[in-house]
Amino acid sequence: MPSQRSSLMQPIPEETRKTPSAAAEDKRWSRPECQLWTGMLLLGTCLLYCTRVTMPVCTVAMSQDFGWNKKEAGIVLSSFFWGYCLTQVVGGHLGDRIGGEKVILLSASAWGFITVTTPLLAHLGSGHLAFVTFSRILTGLLQGVYFPALTSLLSQRVQESERSFTYSTVGAGSQVGTLVTGGIGSVLLDRCGWQSVFYFSGGLTLLWVYYVYKYLLDEKDLVLALGVLAQGLPVTRPSKVPWRQLFRKASVWAVICSQLSSACSFFILLSWLPTFFKETFPHSKGWVFNVVPWLLAIPASLFSGFISDRLISQGYRVITVRKFMQVMGLGLSSIFALCLGHTTSFLKSMIFASASIGFQTFNHSGISVNIQDLAPSCAGFLFGVANTAGALAGVVGVCLGGYLIETTGSWTCVFHLVAIVSNLGLGTFLVFGKAQRVDLVPTHEDL
């Protein structure tokens, strides 16, 4: 008995005893793995926006073919967000449980297929508006899981000191994708018709899915994930995160409010800027206003991540850096949006639009990373909650934008709406935003 007791009293060997932080370290990507995945996720985000922006680029041509007015075009444009807002939390939860990379791959394969088949749906009988709206809702449902799953993946696999640059690099794919569809898509639109733009973006997405599946993912892990989804079973033990405690924190609501404002203002500009330039400057080249703002936004996004990590490494408080990024991403960008509604010069409009879109990319190094600061153990879920709020606001914002244009005939009201929404979110984050973790479960040692 003494020998048994003494053996039971022996400390657990250090190599077999792992703290949560040590277990998290085991899941981190190595430098080569991080570089490879960053490149592939950058491309994935690019294709996400290629398919998302296809409809705004083609709206004018499709409206002419099918006889849609501004309100009907607004319904089609906003229908994406009807689906998008429903799967944010699900995407984050699944990313936390089965792995964000698997969620991303499965959803991309489905939205790529739907994008390719959208022109076919549009010509099914006389209900073209209903069929196109339905396809956009499905696309929104499938793309809604992407960023929550991405946030979950990066919070688990990337070192904290590198998250801002990694996230801003991957986030730059949104501008690259918009740029690709705006440039190549505009050429295809003029030469081959609007259907070719859908075939182009959807086909590239399916090729990306094949490459990631073939070379980066373990087939057994993907099959296991599919089995888990089919059975509806959790992969890991139930979460012990104190949700009631989490949502009592003002900092959590501040980041949700700021994400809502950021997403809403971005979606309004994303959806309506092509139509604004097409109608205000009808003799301008489509590829110019569909390319230049997003082209300049790419280095802006990379710079925001670089300067954010640099400031933190030099000793500036994390929350100070996050708030500075939001002043640029919501405050300064809204000023240029206001200017956009008070000029009749094409050149000035291009400058203001480029500046507004460019400064919005600073949000990648602000609130997007602040969610990982607050709750790295459930970052996907929390981002899903925040982006659900943003998507719902996007539905209202895009529809309201179409209504304002139709009833007032003025684009100034739309840009005023962007400025109001942006500054409400900025003010909330500046007052209540923090960077301390709020997902830690109190232990006896803490009492």
UniProtKB/Swiss-Prot annotation:
Keywords: Cytoplasmic vesicle, Lysosome, Membrane, Transmembrane, Transmembrane helix, Transport. Voltage-gated ATP nucleotide uniporter that can also transport the purine nucleotides ADP and GTP. Uses the membrane potential as the driving force to control ATP accumulation in lysosomes and secretory vesicles. By controlling ATP storage in lysosomes, regulates ATP-dependent proteins of these organelles. Also indirectly regulates the exocytosis of ATP through its import into lysosomes in astrocytes and secretory vesicles such as adrenal chromaffin granules, mucin granules and synaptic vesicles. The chain crosses the membrane at residues 36-58, 74-94, 103-123, 129-149, 169-189, 197-217, 252-272, 287-307, 327-347, 380-400, 413-433. It holds the Pfam family MFS_1. It catalyses: ATP(in) = ATP(out); ADP(in) = ADP(out); GTP(in) = GTP(out). This is Voltage-gated purine nucleotide uniporter SLC17A9. Activity is chloride-dependent. GO terms for cellular component: chromaffin granule membrane; lysosomal membrane; mucin granule; secretory granule; transport vesicle membrane. Residues 14-26 have a biased composition (Basic and acidic residues). It is a multi-pass membrane protein. It is found in: Cytoplasmic vesicle, Secretory vesicle, Chromaffin granule membrane; Cytoplasmic vesicle, Secretory vesicle membrane; Lysosome membrane. InterPro entries: MFS, MFS_dom, MFS_Na/Anion_cotransporter, MFS_trans_sf, SLC17A9-like, Sugar_transporter_CS. One of its GO terms (molecular function) is guanine nucleotide transmembrane transporter activity. Residues 1-26 are annotated as: Disordered.
